[in-house]
UniProtKB/Swiss-Prot annotation:
The lineage of its organism: Eukaryota, Fungi, Dikarya, Ascomycota, Pezizomycotina. This is Spermidine synthase. GO terms for molecular function: spermidine synthase activity. Belongs to the spermidine/spermine synthase family. GO terms for biological process: pantothenate biosynthetic process; spermidine biosynthetic process. InterPro entries: PABS, PABS_CS, SAM-dependent_MTases_sf, Spermi_synthase, Spermi_synthase_euk, Spermidine_synt_N, Spermidine_synt_N_sf. Keywords: Spermidine biosynthesis, Transferase. Residues 11-246 form the PABS domain.
Length: 291
């Protein structure tokens, strides 16, 4: 069988070049291209890297690597889940690799976790090539819906305790998930006291976008805060989240629920109650911009 070629791979190196981070590129050494297809919505590439395990790339942008995915998946999930007193019904928008689902079902209080992703190809290929992440799909509490998250949400009012939006960047199929009408849909789909997290880009590269995101969220939710995590294979090594609550008295910066240290170390490789608090502490330049 001939080797699979892809325009982002030259001389054995994958190059991630995007208008969203001009003048810089992330490169990973490729051991073998495992799969490439054009789905209905995006270009899907999966390759085995020499040092980061299998890598999922959508529209030429790294979504996850097996080496560092846990930082993102754990933080976007547990910042929301542990800011809610008793999350029983959880919705994941996007997240077709299954990583967020894997984290959601670590909480015994969860009775149902629904995932809605627009692209069946991401779900199908993650099950094939990212087994440690897609393990979440096999859990008995999980239901999967393939479709547009925006349209899916319109059918739900006062239904979910936590909604996690694990989207790609605001270009292509995920663009609408960064706009105010979407946050209103999230708000309306939550029960009283409900919490959301949503992927919210990078303080080094996207401060104007984050400033607008926070403003939009504040107009919809009484509580809206920006947190971030470190992750080596995302642009400039960080990614942020908006964490919002319908409860005006909520303090999402401090976990309402926490595991014992022993449980934490068993369940998580990145998240802990201390890092929950620390993730909201921003460097001066970002803090000033977001005030």
């Amino acid at each position: 069988m001939s080797e699979i070629a892809h325009p982002t791979i030259q001389d054995g190196w994958f190059r991630e070049i995007s208008n969203m981070w001009p003048g810089q590129a992330m490169t990973l050494k490729v051991e073998k291209v495992l799969h490439h297809e054009k789905s209905l919505y995006q270009d899907v590439l999966i390759f085995k890297s020499t040092d980061h395990g299998n890598v999922l790339v959508l529209d030429n942008v790294i979504q996850c690597t097996e080496r560092d995915e846990f930082s993102y998946q754990e933080m976007i999930t547990h910042l929301a889940m542990n800011s809610h007193p008793n999350p029983k019904k959880v919705l994941v928008i996007g997240g077709g690799d299954g990583g967020v689902l894997r984290e959601v079902v670590k909480h015994d209080c969860v009775e149902e976790a629904i995932l809605c992703d627009i692209d069946e190809a991401v779900i199908r290929l993650s099950k094939q090539f990212l087994p440690h992440m897609s393990a979440g799909f096999e859990h008995p509490k999980v239901k999967v819906h393939v479709g547009d998250g925006f349209k899916f949400l319109e059918d739900f009012k006062n239904t979910f305790d936590v909604i996690i939006t694990d989207s790609s960047d605001p270009e292509g199929p995920a663009e609408s998930l960064f706009q105010k009408p979407y946050f209103q849909l999230l708000h309306d789909a939550l029960r009283e006291g409900g919490v959301i997290t949503t992927q919210a880009e990078n303080q080094w590269l996207h401060l104007p976008l984050i400033t607008k995101l926070k403003k939009d969220c504040k107009e919809v939710f009484p509580v809206a805060e920006y947190a971030y995590t470190t992750i080596p294979t995302y642009p400039s090594g960080q990614i942020g989240f908006m964490v919002c609550s319908k409860d005006p008295n909520a303090n999402v910066k401090v976990p309402l629920r926490s595991w014992s240290q022993e449980e934490e170390e068993k369940l998580c490789r990145y998240y802990n109650s201390e890092i929950h608090k620390a993730s909201f502490i921003l460097p001066t330049f970002a803090k000033k911009a977001l005030e």
